[in-house]
Amino acid sequence: MIRHLVLFKLDEGVERDDPRVVEGVEAFRSLEGKIPEIRHWELGWNLSDRPIAYDFAINSAFDDQAALRTYVDHPEHQAGVALWREFSSWVIADYEF
């Protein structure tokens, strides 16, 4: 199995209730069930007030690297990426477990 973690940092001045952010969250929330390669899917807002913390996280799992690649290339995923690109930056980590 492959774990795919994504941590998002909202751009300066962008808040969680910004309509673009709300749309972006919903775009990713709705991926579960649309992309059959997803084996595990959870996402949520950070609770920590530490300055090093990121704002939003996605924790997902896939059977193998081919399934992860299918997910990454999927048009629904790419549409979500395009939304988030407008108001955030992010880091990822992919590892076997």
Where are the model-predicted features located?
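C-terminal structural segments of small proteins and small subunits
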Residues: 62-93
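Short S/T/G/P-rich N-terminal loop/turn motif that feeds into the first structured element of a domain
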Residues: 1-55, 63-69, 96-97
